Each structure stands twice: as structure tokens, then as C-alpha cells.
UniProtKB/Swiss-Prot annotation:
Its EC number is 6.3.2.2. Belongs to the glutamate--cysteine ligase type 1 family. Type 1 subfamily. It comes from Shewanella pealeana (strain ATCC 700345 / ANG-SQ1). Pfam families: Glu_cys_ligase. SUPFAM superfamilies: Glutamine synthetase/guanido kinase (SSF55931). This is Glutamate--cysteine ligase.
Length: 522
């Protein structure tokens, strides 16, 4: 494979630069509904937002209280953020006085018993979605499931694939080359995944209510104000063992070395029984507790900071879609909600992600082994827990390397890509890169650094600060202009989604027991 510098040189002609620029992106942003008191909203998904089962833009994640806003695919960043903003603006007008929680970590009082699991109605597919979430509750507790994040979907253009294929040795078919290259991107992303919590991690602190007993926690928390726990150099507690973790999955060792390896590993994981989860029971006294007692109930339960994806046809499982036609796009899952944006992510982050992911694609990407996977996990944990610590050392190929030195080297590569993406008289990518470059030498310029500086300077509780932001963004989004046509379109989408759910529920169907048997047939 050609070196990074060789590839960048080959892509510097006008046609190649245009192909490079034609990226497609989509965003999924999760946000809890909260009452004005700051407590979690416990009511049903608002009817004005349509059916969470069938609406294409507004749904729920784990809980009835956890909204998820989904954009279509856009090639233009301004249009992407505008669409996300309009969906937020419409939604906040229909929350009956509730607000959206603008950070990843919830401030929740309780044992999780009252957190309402998302309800998708009485159709078999709706019941299955709810039961999957019930299984997550039994397995990991409800509290972990109401942590929110932002997912970034990304693909490059067919034109770029044809250009890169021309520059390859053509030992694979074009389709196989595309999947192989996406897996190369994924491996490089995993090697560098720590960069995202370093820059964009926004959960260095949380409400003490999230930890049942801070004194018995393994984390060396310090306290600000009345009830805010923090770690001095943490970047993303959401990405730590406090957040999304699953020790059962630690031994799955699913390989990203090829699509075939990945699908083989996923198939094995789906069918691997768990002694721990068997103790819960699948159907107890006539009532389901989980879909099955395997390590993964379904593929979606597999936690990874990046996923290979393809749009499913009909009732295809994710791996069936990939097996049918290969990788279509990737989903970045390592982003905290950005509290400095009303919609959880800002344009400079999107431009950085474009550069970061293109770098992961264009760099050579050797297969990964168990030793490197251990390094990857170690580096990520080091950065989420103490990424802003002066002189922090990470590991690369068995050698220690300072985080700052590694970042400087990376930013040098990103600058070359930014120069290809910016047209004459336009410097959006270079400006975004310069903005985040400030955080390389000065950790206070990271999102987590800014948050901690603000909490310490003002000596406010995390929850108080977040409530102020929630109110500010509520007013901002409520005032955001919605034309009559746009408002009508959202109303129509809501009505049509409810009709679609009602239609699904009116159709003759097999029993739910039989539906599950059919779904899990190998």
C-alpha cells in the first residue's frame, strides 16, 4: 500500500480533491427529557413527536425519557447542522414545559426502578425492542442506560473509492476493496480513538447521585460544591468503567482485521451463552426478562467505539446487511454530548472528525493483534481518566510516547488533508484544526478542561450549571425560526408515524413467542 504522503500527493489534483470533499454524514443525538425541577421526566413519549417505533427523525433510545434525534444523510455540513437544529427546535415546542438535559451524564436520584423503559407498542417488532431494553436493565441496571452521547455516521464518495481503487494494486474487487479499506479505517480509528475523548470528552464531573456510594467507588473522586464529583484530569467519565462497560464482553475478542473475521466473531458472540445472564432467566413465571441469556441478546448490545454499518433491507440483522453487500459507512460512537452546543455537537467538531477519519482511511493500516488491542484499551482508559495530566505517557507498538508528541504528529497529517479540502479563499478546515490544536499544548482548551475551569471558578454544582444550560438552550431553540412549511412537515411526519405504527399493530401476526423463535433461527 502507498504511504500517507504518497496518497496525499496523488489526491492533490482538482478532480481528486473534489472526490475527497464529497463526504456523507449523519448525526444521532441523545438527550434526556427533564422536568423544570431537574428531575427525570417519567411520562410517556410526547404524542406530538410521533411514534418512536416508526418516526425517521425523532425516536427514543433506552428509555421513554431518552429522546434520540436523527438526521438524514447530508453532504453539506451547514445543512446537516440546520436539520438537526430544526428537529430540536420543533421538539422543544412540544415538551410540555420539560427541558433537554444538555450533557452526557445524568443527574438522577433513585435506584433505577422508576426509569421508564421505552415503549414501542404492541407489534411484535415493537415488543422485541422493549424487551431488549428490559434485558439491558436486568443485566447492567437502568442508570447506565440513560447516559447519552452523540453518534456520527460517515462515508466517503463513490468517486473517491474509484480514485483510491485506481491507486491500489487491484488485487481485490472494488466492493471488497471498499469493505477492506473501511476496516483499515476502523483499525486506525481504534489506535487513535483516545484523541476524541481528549479533545471532545465533556464528562470530567458528575452528580454524586450517579454513584450509589462514592466512598466505596474505585475512582479517586474529589468534590466541588455540595454534590459534584470530579477527577482532576478526567476527560470522559462516560467512556470509563463508570459508563458503558460490559465485563462479559471483555473476552469476545472480535477482530477488525477483515469483514470476514468481524462477521465470524460477531456470529460466535451472538451464540455464546453467559452463565451470569442465565441466572436472570429468560422467561420467568410467564414473563420475559430478556431476549435470551447469551453474552449478547442481539448484535446492538456489542459495545464498540466505532461500528461498520450498512442500511438494512427489511428485517435484516446488521451482520446480514454487511455480509450481503459489504460496508457502506461507519458509525463513530465515542462522542460525549457537547454542553457548549444546543444540539450537542458543533461544526468545528464535525470538520475535525472529517479530517480525523480521512487520516484513518489514508494511513497504512496493518492487522491488529491481541498485544496491540491491549495497548488500545490501556491508552483509552488512561485518557478518559487522566487525559489532561501533564506529561501523560501512552503506548504505541510497545514504546512509551507522550500524548502531546503523538498529537503533534497527528495534527501535522491532518493539516495536509485540511489543505486539500479547503478551496482557494476558504479555510474552514484549517480554522477548525487550528481551534482544536490549541488543546494540544493547553489541556484547558479541551471541552473537559473548559468545564472544570468553569465549575471551579464559579464554585457551582454540576447540576446547577447544567440546569442553567438546559434553560438557556430551551429558550434558544424555542426562539429558533421554524417556517410554517417546516412546522407542518414535522407535524405530518408525527401523524404519519403514528398511523404507520397503528397499521403494523393491526396486521395479523404470529405469537410473540414464535416471532422470537423465527428471529433467532440460524
Amino acid at each position: 500500500m502507498k504511504s500517507f504522503n504518497e496518497l496525499v500527493g496523488k489526491l492533490s489534483d482538482p478532480a481528486s480533491r473534489q472526490a475527497l470533499k464529497s463526504m456523507q454524514r449523519g448525526i444521532e443525538r441523545e438527550a434526556l427529557r427533564i422536568e423544570k425541577s431537574g428531575h427525570l421526566a417519567l411520562d410517556k413519549h410526547p404524542k406530538a413527536l410521533g411514534s418512536a417505533l416508526t418516526h425517521s427523525r425523532i425516536t427514543t433510545d433506552y428509555s421513554e425519557s431518552l429522546l434520540e434525534f436523527i438526521t438524514p444523510v447530508f453532504a453539506d455540513i451547514d445543512e446537516l447542522v440546520e436539520d438537526l437544529t430544526l428537529t430540536h427546535a420543533y421538539s422543544v415546542r412540544h415538551l410540555n414545559g420539560q427541558r433537554l438535559w444538555p450533557v452526557s451524564m445524568p443527574c438522577y436520584l433513585g435506584d433505577g426502578a422508576d426509569i421508564p423503559i421505552a415503549d414501542y407498542g404492541s407489534s411484535n417488532s415493537g415488543q422485541m425492542k422493549s424487551l431488549y431494553r428490559k434485558g439491558l436493565t436486568y443485566r447492567y441496571g437502568a442508570q447506565m442506560q440513560i447516559i447519552s452521547g452523540v453518534h456520527f455516521n460517515f462515508s466517503v464518495s463513490d468517486k473517491l473509492w474509484h480514485r483510491l481503487y485506481e491507486l491500489s494494486d487491484k488485487s481485490l474487487s472494488l466492493d471488497d476493496f471498499i469493505s477492506d479499506s473501511y476496516f483499515g479505517l476502523i483499525r486506525n480509528y481504534r489506535r487513535l480513538v483516545w484523541v476524541l475523548p481528549y479533545l471532545f470528552g465533556a464528562s470530567p464531573a458528575l452528580c454524586s447521585t450517579f454513584i450509589q456510594d462514592p466512598k466505596t467507588s474505585n475512582f479517586p473522586f474529589e468534590v466541588i460544591g455540595d454534590g459534584t464529583l470530579f477527577m482532576p484530569y478526567a476527560t470522559s467519565l462516560r467512556m470509563s468503567d463508570l459508563g458503558y462497560t460490559n465485563q462479559e464482553q471483555d473476552n469476545l475478542n472480535i477482530s477488525y482485521n477483515s469483514l470476514t473475521d468481524y462477521l465470524t466473531g460477531m456470529q460466535a458472540a451472538i451464540n455464546m451463552p453467559s452463565a451470569n445472564f442465565a441466572k436472570i432467566g429468560v422467561k420467568v413465571d410467564g414473563e420475559y426478562r430478556q431476549l435470551n441469556d447469551n453474552i449478547l441478546q442481539i448484535e446492538n448490545e456489542f459495545y464498540s467505539p466505532i461500528r461498520a454499518k450498512r442500511v438494512a433491507k427489511g428485517s435484516e440483522k446488521p451482520s446480514e446487511s454487511l455480509a450481503r453487500a459489504g460496508v457502506e459507512y461507519i458509525e463513530v460512537r465515542a462522542l460525549d454530548v457537547n454542553p457548549y452546543s444546543a444540539v450537542g455537537i458543533e461544526k468545528s467538531q464535525i470538520r475535525f472528525l472529517d479530517l480525523f477519519l480521512l487520516n484513518c482511511l489514508l494511513q497504512p493500516s496493518a492487522p491488529s493483534d491481541a498485544t496491540e488491542e491491549a495497548e488500545i484499551a490501556e491508552n483509552l482508559q488512561a485518557v478518559v481518566l487522566e487525559g489532561r495530566k501533564p506529561g501523560l505517557l501512552l503506548k504505541r507498538s510497545g514504546q512509551e510516547l507522550s500524548l502531546t508528541h503523538w498529537l503533534e504528529s497527528l495534527f501535522g497529517n491532518l493539516k495536509q488533508i485540511a489543505q486539500l479540502l479547503d478551496d482557494e479563499g476558504q479555510d474552514d478546515y484549517q480554522v477548525a484544526l487550528a481551534k482544536w490544536h490549541k488543546a494540544v499544548e493547553n489541556p484547558n482548551e479541551t471541552l473537559s478542561g473548559k468545564i472544570m475551569a468553569g465549575l471551579k471558578d464559579e464554585q457551582v454544582d454540576h447540576s446547577e450549571w447544567v440546569m442553567e444550560l438546559a434553560e438557556q438552550y430551551h429558550q434558544q431553540l424555542k426562539a429558533y425560526p421554524l417556517t410554517e412549511n417546516v412546522d407542518k412537515r414535522y407535524q405530518q411526519d408525527a401523524v404519519e408515524s403514528l398511523e404507520k405504527q397503528a397499521y403494523l399493530e393491526s396486521q395479523p401476526s404470529v405469537s410473540f413467542d414464535q416471532f422470537l423463535v423465527d428471529y433467532f433461527k440460524v
